[in-house]
A protein has these predicted regions:
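Flavin-dependent oxidoreductase catalytic cores
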Residues: 1-338
Length: 338
């Protein structure tokens, strides 16, 4: 299986599995990541982990802490020869993720996205980043060596760094730079996930180029390119339709060619985009195909079939499932509550 440039890396991208018990990753979570952290995978990023004192996007989010459960999770990944990664995030008090795939709230959605940062003082912003710094220290102490800031999908960090939405974007960008410096000083890698567009025209049609300029100025090791805000249009976050997939890939590749000195992670069923002609600064992020099949890197014919069962929150469930998991050879561990 040729992936083009020898330096191209494969990432298992962040997903909120819901495999959580009392706010901590449970045995299902450990098994899930250990099963997928092999066969040449460079880094597995444990997804949607809430910073200390933060707010989860739903009730099935784990919060980083000094618990030994985090060390066990990181060890389970590293023992398979893969770099343990973790994605840190927070929403805000009163946040509710929508269960529909497309918002019917119209103009009210961007109003909320502007009101939340506007209601925060500079001290509030610094306090939020202090929690990120503390959470990053805890994650590194647990053994995670790749730390990702979740600044996408309409969660709090994505609002704070966006000048179109936040009066604190310059401050937030400076605080991200401090975070990158801290992670590098420990010997870790950093990445930032961001949304190329939100999916709401009243936001996307103004200031897009200035937003991108801020993002590419952040000195993270990798920029993980996503799209969409969760409470606007989830189809952009989880692209399935050919035109949406094409737009996501085209947008990522355009960025990579404009900024050849920056390392990008291409996501959005990007396992189907493996191509020796990809720019050398584009790495492959895989999510749904590896969710469906832990052995996907060895058996690429058995990946995601778009059954949509992984969208557990939208389906009113509390943890991740997959239609392919009915085959024991694909999922050799139980998915029932531990």
């Amino acid at each position: 299986m040729s992936l083009g440039a020898k330096s191209r890396k494969l990432f298992f991208l962040a997903v909120n599995t819901g495999f959580v018990e009392r706010g901590l990753p449970d045995r299902r979570c450990r098994d899930f990541y250990a099963e997928r952290s092999r066969s040449g995978l460079y880094c597995a990023i444990v997804g949607n982990v809430v910073i200390p004192g933060g707010v989860g996007s739903n009730d099935a989010c784990a919060e980083i802490s000094s618990s030994d459960a985090w060390r066990q999770l990181a060890e389970g990944i590293s023992e398979q020869g893969t770099l343990p990664g973790i994605q840190l995030t927070t929403a805000w008090r009163g946040y509710r993720g929508m269960k529909r795939f497309i918002s019917v709230a119209g103009a009210h959605v961007p109003q909320e996205y502007r009101q939340v940062p506007a209601s925060m003082s500079p001290l509030d912003v610094k306090t939020t980043f202090d929690a990120l710094y503390r959470g990053s220290e805890l994650a590194f102490q647990a053994g995670f060596r790749h730390l990702q800031l979740h600044a996408a999908h309409g969660y709090l960090f994505s609002l704070l760094v966006d000048r179109r939405l936040s009066p604190h974007s310059d401050l937030a960008a400076d605080l991200v730079r401090r975070w990158v410096h801290d992670v590098a000083s420990w010997g870790g890698e950093s990445s930032l996930r961001f949304s190329l567009w939100t999916g709401h025209p009243s936001i996307d049609k103004h200031g897009q180029s200035q937003f991108i300029e801020i993002i590419v100025s952040l000195p993270v090791d990798y920029l993980d390119v996503s799209a969409g805000f969760y409470n606007v249009d989830k189809r952009l976050i989880y692209p399935t339709l050919p035109d949406v997939l094409s737009s996501r890939r085209t947008g990522t590749l355009d960025l990579a060619r404009r900024y050849p000195h920056i390392q990008f992670i291409m996501s959005g069923k990007s396992s189907g985009a493996w191509d020796p002609s990809l720019p050398a600064n584009v790495h492959v992020g895989i999510c749904r195909d590896l969710i469906a099949n832990p052995n996907f890197l060895r058996d690429r014919d058995q990946g995601c079939n778009d059954c949509m069962k992984c969208h557990y929150f939208s389906r009113g469930q509390s943890y991740l499932t997959c239609g392919r998991w009915t085959y024991p050879r694909v999922l050799p561990f139980p998915v029932k509550q531990a």
